[in-house]
Every structure is written in structure tokens, then in C-alpha cells.
Design a protein with these regions (language model features):
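Phosphate/diphosphate-binding glycine-rich loops and adjacent basic-rich segments that engage nucleotide
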Residues: 1-36
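Glycine-/charge-enriched secondary-structure boundary and capping motifs
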Residues: 33-50, 54-178
Length: 178
């Protein structure tokens, strides 16, 4: 519904997506698995690249019990652009505010070292958001608080809006404000 909030839950890193490209970028960089990963507070390349995927089930169940969760999507292959539209009616779009969440350093490193754009990072990888939930605006802060109680980080990353037309008449269902 127009006006609903989109809450994003942090990923732990790559999860299970984009490893072919990440491996190519890693090879280009010359970093070795035991090297310190740039900007990762002493974690090694191996630890950053193979960080275990977060399991969201307990936090999600908590919200489903008591809140009006209108949609949810696991941000897997296809990133924001392929996964978020799966939970939206055709007449609306997700407007995502880039920078409204804390992105793990691996994504900035992949962008810079791999000469990628931010849209590519959000298409190929999860960009630091592993799961999204759509809720009424008056429930998003409570949702974030509950998610944090499970030692997960969460943010209000965007809103649902009436779907707009692009310059060529095409419509996109995920619009990221960079």
C-alpha cells in the first residue's frame, strides 16, 4: 500500500550470492585468504568472503505474530531489483534510500576494486540488506526494535509509492535514490 515502510535487516556479507564475480575481483586485487580485509577491523579475506549467512526466521516469526507484515523478501540472487518486486502489487514501487543502512565494507571494496556501480552492487549482491519487510508506517519502529532484540540490525530503508513511468515509458518497481 502506498505509504508503507520498507524495513531492511542487515546481511552478514555476501550470503550465497555473487561469488563468481567476487572471486574474479579478489583475484584481480591480489589479496590472499589470510590477508587482512580492507576496512574490516582485522578480519581476514577468508572470514569476510565466507561469513555465514544470517538466519532470520526467529525475528521474522516474532513480527508475523503481532504486526501487520504486508510483504517480505529474502534478498538473494538478483538483489534488490529482482526480489523486492515479488512482494509488491503491480501499481506500486519501492523507493529505497541508499545510505539509510550501514553497508558492510565488502560491498564498497567490491565496487571500487571491481569497477562496479552501486546499481550493479544492488543487483548482483545484497548490498548489506539480507531481508526486507513491508509494514504500515506506524509499525516500522516497533519492527526495528523487535528485530534488534534478536541481535540483528535493521533500518527503515524506503517506502512504497505509486508506480511512476521512466523516460522511455518503462516502469521500474524498485527505485533507488542514490
Amino acid at each position: 500500500q502506498v505509504g508503507d515502510h520498507i524495513v531492511g535487516i542487515a546481511s552478514s556479507g555476501l550470503h550465497s550470492n555473487g561469488y563468481s564475480l567476487a572471486r574474479k575481483v579478489l583475484e584481480k586485487s591480489g589479496l590472499k585468504p589470510e590477508d587482512a580485509f580492507p576496512g574490516a577491523d582485522g578480519a581476514t579475506v577468508r572470514e569476510v568472503m565466507l561469513a555465514p549467512t544470517i538466519i532470520y526466521v526467529e525475528a521474522v516469526r516474532s513480527l508475523l505474530r503481532d504486526l501487520n507484515v504486508k510483504g517480505m523478501a529474502h534478498i538473494t540472487g538478483g538483489g534488490f531489483y529482482d526480489n523486492i518486486p515479488r512482494v509488491l502489487p503491480a501499481q506500486v514501487e519501492a523507493r529505497i534510500n541508499f545510505g539509510s543502512w550501514q553497508m558492510p565494507p565488502v560491498f564498497r571494496w567490491l565496487k571500487e576494486t571491481g569497477d562496479l556501480s552501486w546499481p550493479e552492487i544492488l543487483q548482483i549482491f545484497n548490498g548489506g540488506i539480507g531481508y526486507v519487510m513491508v509494514l504500515p508506517p506506524d509499525q516500522s519502529e516497533e519492527a526495528i526494535s523487535r528485530i534488534q532484540a534478536f541481535n540483528l540490525r535493521a533500518w527503515h530503508i524506503g517506502d512504497v509509492a505509486r508506480r511512476s513511468k521512466g523516460d522511455g515509458g518503462e516502469t521500474e518497481q524498485v527505485v533507488v535514490n542514490f
